[in-house]
């Protein structure tokens, strides 16, 4: 734990978590509407559509947990929750990559939205690692 007079939380990281939370909520709703569009108007195999929607729900769970632990770890200046958030960044980036590259049909809007999600993941990972290094260096003092 950091001394009481020393604030080590990363403000840019917290801003990214906040923006990513709102962006992901919008992404999730748009992606559900896009799947509805694909299911109704495109010859989308039913099994693939069900799989993609189930994976989107799993992605929602991973992302909510990742953002929660990242925010709590940053604000409370704790390494463990921030480390959990770092570990969950990789499955989150893999899911964004799946929706960017491996779906049956990838619309241009989806490609743009998933690219933005990957940018958020990369930026947050970099800032989380720097914040973890800051927390660790203050433990030695």
Curated annotation (Swiss-Prot):
Keywords: Cell projection, Cilium biogenesis/degradation, Cytoplasm, Cytoskeleton, Membrane, Transmembrane, Transmembrane helix. InterPro entries: Uncharacterised_TM-17 (IPR019184). It comes from the Eukaryota. The chain crosses the membrane at residues 15-35, 49-69, 82-102, 115-135. Its main location: membrane. The keyword Metal-binding does not apply. GO terms for biological process: cilium assembly. The keyword Cytoplasm applies. Pfam families: Transmemb_17. One of its GO terms (cellular component) is ciliary transition zone. It is a multi-pass membrane protein. It is found in: Membrane; Cytoplasm, Cytoskeleton, Cilium basal body. Part of the tectonic-like complex which is required for tissue-specific ciliogenesis and may regulate ciliary membrane composition. Part of the tectonic-like complex (also named B9 complex). Interacts with TMEM107. This is Transmembrane protein 216. It comes from Mus musculus.
């Amino acid at each position: 734990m950091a001394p009481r007079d020393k604030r080590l939380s990363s403000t840019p990281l917290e801003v990214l978590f906040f923006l990513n939370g709102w962006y992901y909520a919008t992404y999730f709703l748009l992606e559900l509407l896009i799947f509805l569009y694909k299911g109704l108007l495109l010859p989308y195999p039913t099994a693939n559509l069900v799989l993609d929607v189930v994976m989107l729900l799993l992605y929602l769970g991973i992302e909510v947990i990742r953002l929660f632990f990242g925010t709590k770890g940053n604000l409370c200046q704790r390494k463990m929750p921030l480390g959990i958030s770092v570990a969950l960044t990789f499955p989150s980036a893999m899911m964004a990559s799946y929706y960017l590259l491996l779906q049956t049909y990838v619309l241009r809007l989806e490609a743009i939205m998933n690219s933005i999600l990957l940018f958020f993941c990369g930026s947050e990972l970099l800032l989380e690692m720097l914040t973890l290094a800051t927390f660790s260096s203050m433990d030695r003092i």
